[in-house]
Structure formats: C-alpha cells, structure tokens
Amino acid sequence: MAANVPTLETRRLVLRPISLADAPQAQALFPKWDIVQFLDAHVPWPYPPDGALVFYRDVAIPAMERGEAWHWSIRLREAPDQLIGSITLRLGAGKNRGFWIGKAWQGNGFAAEACDALMAFWFEELGQHLLRVEKAATNEASRKISEREGMRLVATEERTFVGGK
C-alpha cells in the first residue's frame, strides 16, 4: 500500500487502499458484462484470469507509489473483509475518477456514497480545483451520480468502450 493513500470511511463504507491481496476478490467480481461494458476499451474483454492481479501489480500500485493515483477497494463497514467494488482518483487533465460496484451490491447507493467521500478527498485534502469524469453516454447510473454531485456536461466526443461506441 502506498503511504499517500489513506483509508476513508463513510456511514456505511470503508474505502481501503488496494493491495495485491485484494486481487482474488476483485477478479471474482469484476469480469461481468454489466460492470465492464461502460469502461474504456483498453480494459481487455474477455477479462483474463489474472487481469486483476496484473492491473494491481503493474498499473495501480505503481501509480499509487508515484503519487499519480489513488485506488481504493470499497467495503461495507459491517463486512470489511468483503470487497464489493473499487474506486479510483487520478491526477491529470483526463479522466480523474472511475469506479465499479459488484452486481450484488448495485442499486443501494454505495457508489454514490463512495463518490461523495472521494469528492471531499479530491477537493479538501488534495486541493484540486476541478474533477473530470468521463462516461459512456448510455451509462445512466453513473450519469445520475455525477448530476447529484452538481457536475455538468462540458463536452461530448466519440469514444470506444468495452461495449462499443
């Protein structure tokens, strides 16, 4: 775990910095069409059997160590050993935030609650002035979270996602 990634807590959630030990749980939950269809096309599909481990080991954890990104596992306070999703913040001019929630936990407001915690961290702790989130136009659930947070649409462009354009 990178020292610059704190554990964050909300009313119902614990956001814990990811570690290689999280890879098996992430691997079990992540490679589902309902989750990956709205993600950038660079996410391999079908998802490889070691996809979570490779991503954590080769991409996420090194970015955390360099101070370029913050990756958390999302867990319920009442069951902190069970990973239910993941959420990320990244520095730079592009996409600053991304998240996914396992199918069994979708529709309960967990993504919105995790996003609220990250908004506070991004603006208050990191001192950032702008948060950009990119999403597939058909990703209604993610769009609703952004609207609830007071975000506004500033641009549209054609992009390729796992599920197409």
Task: Give a label for each model feature.
Residues V36-D58, W70-W72:
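Conserved GNAT-fold acetyl-CoA-binding loop/helix
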